[in-house]
């Protein structure tokens, strides 16, 4: 069973592809696994925020990044929002932004 990776917008895709090299390599490696095995890679790779919102956890030499995503019925994994993490906890405003983007995406479908 194969999944597909979609992006909420061109901007989201560009932001992810402009991550520092080691974070981008980690993203490509993990999304390849997600395509083959599904979105639930488990900790430390993915985590759930509830309500169908998940995060892809990227760690590399240049730091830590997070990519929020959701899954759709048709084996689709939709990348919603990414950011470079600078604090121990995921900032509340980044979570709120990801939830809003997810709701917008669902309303557009």
Language model region names:
Residues 67:
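Portal/gating segments that form or line small-molecule/metal binding sites
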Residues 80:
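Conserved catalytic cores of phosphodiester-cleaving nucleases, focusing on short active-site segments
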Residues 1-64, 73-77, 86-109:
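Basic, Lys/Arg-enriched alpha-helical interface segments
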């Amino acid at each position: 069973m194969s999944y597909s990776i979609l992006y909420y917008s061109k901007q989201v895709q560009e932001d992810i592809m402009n991550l520092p090299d080691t974070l981008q390599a980690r993203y490509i490696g993990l999304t390849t696994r997600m395509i083959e095995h599904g979105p639930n890679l488990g900790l430390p790779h993915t985590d759930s925020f509830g309500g169908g919102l998940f995060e892809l956890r990227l760690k590399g030499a240049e730091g830590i990044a997070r990519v929020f995503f959701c899954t759709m019925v048709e084996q689709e994994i939709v990348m919603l929002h990414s950011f470079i993490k600078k604090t121990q906890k995921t900032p509340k405003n980044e979570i709120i932004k990801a939830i809003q983007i997810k709701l917008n995406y669902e309303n557009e479908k």
